[in-house]
Amino acid sequence: MTNLDTASTTLLACFLLCFCVLLCVCLLIRPLLLSVSTYTSLIILVLLLWITAASAFRCFIVYIIFVYIPLFLIHTHARFLIT
């Protein structure tokens, strides 16, 4: 196994870990329960992007910027509204 294969596998593992964490967050927080279908659709699009057009690293960066950070901001805003 080369370094590239190891890095690719590690990146995929991080990607799937983030996916599982965010899916659990969506399921545990009631206002985000309705966003599960939207989130899964988005993750399928990111995976299709990874398979067809971009490298794993680029897709991971896209995932962080356009999925992970916005969901964190939505969660923070919801907590602010509750308190």
Curated annotation (Swiss-Prot):
One of its GO terms (biological process) is symbiont-mediated suppression of host antigen processing and presentation of peptide antigen via MHC class I. It is found in: Host membrane; Host endoplasmic reticulum membrane; Host Golgi apparatus. Keywords: Early protein, Host endoplasmic reticulum, Host Golgi apparatus, Host membrane, Host-virus interaction, Inhibition of host adaptive immune response by virus, Inhibition of host MHC class I molecule presentation by virus, Membrane, Transmembrane, Transmembrane helix, Viral immunoevasion. GO terms for cellular component: host cell endoplasmic reticulum membrane; host cell Golgi apparatus; host cell plasma membrane; membrane. It holds the Pfam family Papilloma_E5. It comes from the Viruses. InterPro entries: Papilloma_E5_alpha. The chain crosses the membrane at residues 9-29, 42-62, 63-83. It is a multi-pass membrane protein. Belongs to the papillomaviridae E5 protein family. Acts to keep host cells in a proliferation-competent state upon differentiation. Enhances host epidermal growth factor receptor (EGFR) activation after stimulation by EGF by inhibiting EGFR internalization. Induces a redistribution of host caveolin-1 and glycosphingolipid (ganglioside GM1) components of lipid rafts to the plasma membrane. Since GM1s inhibit cytotoxic T-lymphocytes, block immune synapse formation, and enhance proliferative signaling by the EGFR, E5 may enhance immune evasion and cell proliferation via a common mechanism. HPV16, in comparison to HPV types 6 and 11, is more often associated with malignant genital cancers in humans. Part of the antigens expressed and presented within HPV-positive head and neck tumors. Homooligomer. Interacts with host BCAP31; this interaction seems to correlate with the ability of HPV-positive differentiated cells to remain competent for proliferation. Interacts with host ATP6V0C. Interacts (via N-terminus) with host HLA class I heavy chains A1, A2, A3 and B8; these interactions inhibit host immune response by sequestering MHC class I peptides to the host Golgi apparatus. Interacts with host TMC6, TMC8 and ZNT1; the interaction blocks their negative regulation. This is Probable protein E5. It comes from Human papillomavirus type 16. The lineage of its organism: Viruses, Monodnaviria, Shotokuvirae, Cossaviricota, Papovaviricetes.
